[in-house]
Amino acid sequence: MSQVGRVRSSHHFESVCLDAEVRVVLVALDHAGLHTLSSALNESLRPIHREELHLLHFPNSPEENLRKRPAEPSPQIHGGAPHLPWLCVEKLDLLPENHAVFLQERTAQLFEGSFFFSRSPAHSISPLLQFRWGHCP
Protein backbone atom coordinates (compact mmCIF):
# COMPACT_ATOMS: atom_id res chain seq x y z
CA MET A 1 0.00 0.00 0.00
CA SER A 2 1.41 3.38 -0.90
CA GLN A 3 1.85 6.07 1.66
CA VAL A 4 -0.47 9.04 1.28
CA GLY A 5 1.70 11.50 3.15
CA ARG A 6 4.50 11.84 5.61
CA VAL A 7 3.29 13.82 8.59
CA ARG A 8 5.68 15.82 10.73
CA SER A 9 2.99 16.29 13.37
CA SER A 10 -0.76 15.82 13.51
CA HIS A 11 -1.21 19.32 12.07
CA HIS A 12 1.67 19.82 9.67
CA PHE A 13 2.67 18.05 6.48
CA GLU A 14 6.32 17.47 5.73
CA SER A 15 5.39 16.38 2.23
CA VAL A 16 2.40 15.05 0.36
CA CYS A 17 2.50 12.12 -2.04
CA LEU A 18 -0.68 10.69 -3.48
CA ASP A 19 -1.19 7.33 -5.14
CA ALA A 20 -2.60 7.38 -8.65
CA GLU A 21 -5.83 5.77 -7.47
CA VAL A 22 -6.51 8.35 -4.80
CA ARG A 23 -8.89 11.10 -5.89
CA VAL A 24 -8.64 14.37 -4.03
CA VAL A 25 -10.56 17.61 -3.94
CA LEU A 26 -9.01 20.80 -2.68
CA VAL A 27 -11.44 23.14 -1.02
CA ALA A 28 -10.95 26.54 0.51
CA LEU A 29 -12.75 27.52 3.68
CA ASP A 30 -13.20 31.24 4.07
CA HIS A 31 -15.53 33.35 6.18
CA ALA A 32 -18.35 32.85 3.68
CA GLY A 33 -18.20 29.07 3.87
CA LEU A 34 -16.89 26.11 1.92
CA HIS A 35 -16.03 26.63 -1.75
CA THR A 36 -14.98 23.94 -4.17
CA LEU A 37 -12.26 25.17 -6.49
CA SER A 38 -13.34 24.86 -10.09
CA SER A 39 -11.15 23.97 -13.06
CA ALA A 40 -11.39 27.60 -14.14
CA LEU A 41 -9.07 28.84 -11.40
CA ASN A 42 -9.29 32.44 -12.53
CA GLU A 43 -12.98 32.35 -11.58
CA SER A 44 -12.19 31.01 -8.11
CA LEU A 45 -9.19 33.09 -7.06
CA ARG A 46 -9.88 35.05 -3.93
CA PRO A 47 -7.97 35.80 -0.72
CA ILE A 48 -7.71 32.55 1.23
CA HIS A 49 -6.21 32.12 4.66
CA ARG A 50 -3.54 29.43 4.80
CA GLU A 51 -4.79 27.92 8.05
CA GLU A 52 -8.26 27.59 6.55
CA LEU A 53 -7.24 25.39 3.64
CA HIS A 54 -8.51 21.85 3.87
CA LEU A 55 -7.67 18.81 1.80
CA LEU A 56 -10.70 16.59 1.24
CA HIS A 57 -10.22 12.86 0.73
CA PHE A 58 -12.75 10.41 -0.59
CA PRO A 59 -13.77 7.67 1.90
CA ASN A 60 -11.84 4.95 0.06
CA SER A 61 -8.53 6.80 0.31
CA PRO A 62 -5.77 5.32 2.49
CA GLU A 63 -5.64 7.77 5.40
CA GLU A 64 -3.92 5.92 8.25
CA ASN A 65 -1.52 8.77 8.92
CA LEU A 66 -3.92 11.66 8.46
CA ARG A 67 -5.81 13.65 11.05
CA LYS A 68 -9.47 13.13 10.18
CA ARG A 69 -12.55 15.15 11.00
CA PRO A 70 -16.00 15.21 9.39
CA ALA A 71 -16.58 17.83 6.73
CA GLU A 72 -19.73 19.84 7.26
CA PRO A 73 -22.25 20.16 4.41
CA SER A 74 -22.27 23.55 2.76
CA PRO A 75 -25.24 25.09 0.94
CA GLN A 76 -22.73 26.94 -1.25
CA ILE A 77 -21.59 23.68 -2.84
CA HIS A 78 -24.25 22.37 -5.17
CA GLY A 79 -26.14 19.66 -3.32
CA GLY A 80 -24.11 20.21 -0.17
CA ALA A 81 -20.72 18.74 0.63
CA PRO A 82 -20.56 15.04 1.47
CA HIS A 83 -19.40 14.01 4.93
CA LEU A 84 -15.74 13.31 4.19
CA PRO A 85 -12.59 13.42 6.30
CA TRP A 86 -10.49 16.52 5.92
CA LEU A 87 -6.91 17.40 6.65
CA CYS A 88 -5.79 20.88 7.63
CA VAL A 89 -2.50 21.80 5.95
CA GLU A 90 -0.85 24.71 7.71
CA LYS A 91 2.77 24.76 6.57
CA LEU A 92 3.55 26.27 3.18
CA ASP A 93 7.33 26.19 3.67
CA LEU A 94 7.42 22.41 4.23
CA LEU A 95 6.37 21.62 0.68
CA PRO A 96 8.68 21.74 -2.36
CA GLU A 97 7.99 24.56 -4.78
CA ASN A 98 8.69 22.58 -7.94
CA HIS A 99 5.81 20.13 -7.64
CA ALA A 100 2.77 20.35 -9.84
CA VAL A 101 -0.66 20.92 -8.33
CA PHE A 102 -3.44 18.53 -9.22
CA LEU A 103 -7.00 19.49 -8.40
CA GLN A 104 -10.20 17.66 -9.15
CA GLU A 105 -13.74 18.88 -9.36
CA ARG A 106 -16.41 16.66 -7.89
CA THR A 107 -17.57 15.70 -11.39
CA ALA A 108 -14.53 16.55 -13.54
CA GLN A 109 -11.35 14.76 -14.45
CA LEU A 110 -7.97 15.65 -13.04
CA PHE A 111 -6.17 18.65 -14.40
CA GLU A 112 -2.81 20.19 -13.70
CA GLY A 113 -2.48 23.76 -12.55
CA SER A 114 -1.45 26.00 -9.71
CA PHE A 115 -3.34 26.93 -6.59
CA PHE A 116 -2.60 30.47 -5.46
CA PHE A 117 -3.76 32.80 -2.76
CA SER A 118 -3.25 36.50 -2.19
CA ARG A 119 -2.06 37.82 1.15
CA SER A 120 -3.69 41.06 0.15
CA PRO A 121 -6.05 41.71 -2.77
CA ALA A 122 -3.80 44.60 -3.82
CA HIS A 123 -0.57 42.60 -3.78
CA SER A 124 0.89 39.83 -5.89
CA ILE A 125 -0.32 36.28 -5.40
CA SER A 126 1.91 33.54 -4.03
CA PRO A 127 1.70 29.75 -4.24
CA LEU A 128 -0.18 28.35 -1.27
CA LEU A 129 0.11 24.60 -1.61
CA GLN A 130 1.54 22.17 -4.12
CA PHE A 131 1.23 18.41 -4.52
CA ARG A 132 3.11 15.74 -6.43
CA TRP A 133 0.94 13.11 -8.14
CA GLY A 134 2.53 9.67 -8.11
CA HIS A 135 4.07 7.06 -5.86
CA CYS A 136 6.09 7.87 -2.78
CA PRO A 137 9.74 6.87 -3.01
UniProtKB/Swiss-Prot annotation:
UniProt superkingdom: Eukaryota
What is the name listed in the Swiss-Prot or TrEMBL entry for this protein?
Putative uncharacterized protein encoded by FER1L6-AS2
The organism is Homo sapiens
